[in-house]
Amino acid sequence: MMPMNQEFIQKLRFNEKGLIPAIAQDWLDGAILMMAWMNKESLEKTLITGEVHYWSRSREKLWHKGETSGHFQILKGIRFDCDSDVMLLSIEQVGSIACHTGARSCFFQEVEENIPDLEQNSTFNRPLSNTCSELFEVIKDRSSNPQKNSYTNSLLKDGDNKILKKIGEEGSEFVMACKDNDHESISNEAADLIFHIQVALKYHKVEWRDVLEVLAKRRQSKSNPK
């Protein structure tokens, strides 16, 4: 639960209706999940409970995110912008679904036309920091919706021994690339190794975010030694 320090609320600039936009961001991989509105009441409720509450403009009442779907948002931190009129909520998304459509993020509709930079760099039209999380979502989708001739599906079908054998092979190739100090090969072999590790995680029903959470906790413990 977040500490009940509410002094910062006085610095916020709510609009004429007493509302302020709040953007929810995954606290582990930085993915933008959704945007909704808050007022002082919903913000105070969020701080007290540690679970995000918004203000529903259509229903004109508090909206406890996840109260019907079970996809609660656990508050991890709050920032607000230089004008103090937009908030960024760092949250843990329960169930990995923020959108009412069932998508992880509400921001899944992409505009790709008439944007020169996208045409020149179409491979990198999204944050690279999200790539591993997105890759794991693809692996999960392949598991739920098998596709013909899918390498991922063949690994999952063949099972643990095949997956672990591939991890051993890719690990050895990564070591050899490092010994040769071949930067391109190191990058390629590291990518192969990460992919096969993620397949193993999925096979054993371990979420990628569980790994990220372990890393985050280790980083926090090292930066805040007892």
From Swiss-Prot:
One of its GO terms (biological process) is L-histidine biosynthetic process. GO terms for molecular function: ATP binding; phosphoribosyl-AMP cyclohydrolase activity; phosphoribosyl-ATP diphosphatase activity. Pfam families: PRA-CH, PRA-PH. SUPFAM superfamilies: all-alpha NTP pyrophosphatases (SSF101386), HisI-like (SSF141734). It comes from the Bacteria. It is an enzyme of class 3 (hydrolase). It catalyses: 1-(5-phospho-beta-D-ribosyl)-ATP + H2O = 1-(5-phospho-beta-D-ribosyl)-5'-AMP + diphosphate + H(+); 1-(5-phospho-beta-D-ribosyl)-5'-AMP + H2O = 1-(5-phospho-beta-D-ribosyl)-5-[(5-phospho-beta-D-ribosylamino)methylideneamino]imidazole-4-carboxamide. Residues 1-131 are annotated as: Phosphoribosyl-AMP cyclohydrolase. Its EC number is 3.5.4.19, 3.6.1.31. Its main location: cytoplasm. GO terms for cellular component: cytoplasm. Residues 132-226 are annotated as: Phosphoribosyl-ATP pyrophosphohydrolase. It is found in: Cytoplasm. Keywords: Amino-acid biosynthesis, ATP-binding, Cytoplasm, Histidine biosynthesis, Hydrolase, Multifunctional enzyme, Nucleotide-binding. InterPro entries: His_synth_HisIE, HisE, PRA-CH, PRib-ATP_PPHydrolase-like, PRib_AMP_CycHydrolase_dom, PRib_AMP_CycHydrolase_sf. Pathway: Amino-acid biosynthesis; L-histidine biosynthesis; L-histidine from 5-phospho-alpha-D-ribose 1-diphosphate: step 2/9; Amino-acid biosynthesis; L-histidine biosynthesis; L-histidine from 5-phospho-alpha-D-ribose 1-diphosphate: step 3/9. In the N-terminal section; belongs to the PRA-CH family. In the C-terminal section; belongs to the PRA-PH family. PANTHER family: HISTIDINE BIOSYNTHESIS BIFUNCTIONAL PROTEIN (PTHR42945), HISTIDINE BIOSYNTHESIS BIFUNCTIONAL PROTEIN HIS7 (PTHR42945:SF1). This is Histidine biosynthesis bifunctional protein HisIE.
